[in-house]
Amino acid sequence: MRRPHNRRDFIKTSAAIGAGYWVAGGTSLKASISANEEIRFACIGIDGKGSSDSNDAKNNGKVVAICDIDDGFLDKAQKAFPDAKRFNDYRKLLEEMDKSFDAVTVSTPDHMHAVVAAQAMKMGKHCFCQKPLTHSIEEARVLGNIAREQKVVTQMGNQGTADSTLRLSAALIKKGEIGKIKEVHVWTNRPVWPQSKGLQVKTAAPPASIHWDLWVGGAKKHEYSPEIHPFKWRGFWAFGTGALGDMACHTFNMPFMALNLRNPTSVEAVCDEHDGVMYPKSSQIHFVFPDLDGRPGLNVYWYDGGRMPPAEVLAGCPKAKNGDREVPFNSGSVIVGEKGKLFSPGDYGGDAANTGLVFGNEFKNQREYARGVEYVRSPGHFVEFANAIKGEGAAVSNFPDYAGPLSETILLGNLALLAGKKVEWDASMMVAKDASPEVAELVRHQYQNGYSL
């Protein structure tokens, strides 16, 4: 597909991709592994989500290399993968193991996703990368372009994409069960890690087992802190993407699939104060999407840190049990149409018992509307990725057609948080109007310490 040369071409191209991936599997790919061959995986980042990703790799092939900046994590992983070569620096892994593996899993902190994935894909390696796909907006576009050019199989780690409950929800919206869509509300109970203005972290010399310079990678120099690594880096602008980046690739996923929610024209945020070091404790973000491929323009609202949609949005929706009380689900999404609403609770869109349509104040499980509704059923999110490497089917959350545009859209919310004002966005040019240098850095990173895409 040619590169769009102007805004009109860009919008047409985006609409065509969004409409076509679901049927045709998106970008044309090369199959480098036969159905009977074993896929050889190199796993980069092997604790946290890296633990489950490397285990999925083991279940769908052979893990031949493991990489982490933390020797303690490597020691633990070595017990599960005794024959795998171990590395601290992913660059050495890629150089030394080039001919010895076929695919990578990238489960590093957010700020290193793009540089690792880009280098691996440029070598012709298939890539499974954790969500959000990238730390900056441009990185998401670039990774999609590299994947398309190299014709490698890709998949982002938003596993709910493969869930039949989520896919049925999207199909019902596409079918028009609740009529013309008016607005969408999405929320999460995150953050579950410390983040707010003025929080101080204690710095120290890194333990000998932690290779801190490799952890910092392409970000600006920062002293080691046990309150950053592991896990709590999510709350720092320099390394993570906050509550929005951490969870919207899950909770925003079903509405994105159903409504092709890409390329908003403006984003505006209301949030607690923040200092540009850590993300705010809570926020509410308003995305405005234009008409696209027959889908009317609409408003999408995001809530985190305890903020919730208005009571009228949740009226008639099932509630969760909290001891003897019934309370609203602390994460989920509601799509509001002219005829009714679709309610999808939980993080991943897979709560079959409580997902359904609301007409007035009457809830009906979506399974009552499933007869005759067509959607592609997945063998499992990672299995889908492994099968696609062998030329069997397609990975839906691939970088060019799905994960990249989804991540771009989500990360625009952080742009509004940092800007502190309404952001007018030109997706074709990847430009935020009147952006400060700090805001522009969230669009296009300036890498440090010799790292690059």
Question: What residues fall within each predicted segment?
Answer:
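Beta-strand-loop-alpha-helix segment that lines the small-molecule cofactor/substrate pocket
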Residues: 109-110, 114-162, 176
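N-terminal Rossmann-like NAD(P) cofactor-binding module of classical short-chain dehydrogenase/reductase
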Residues: 104-105
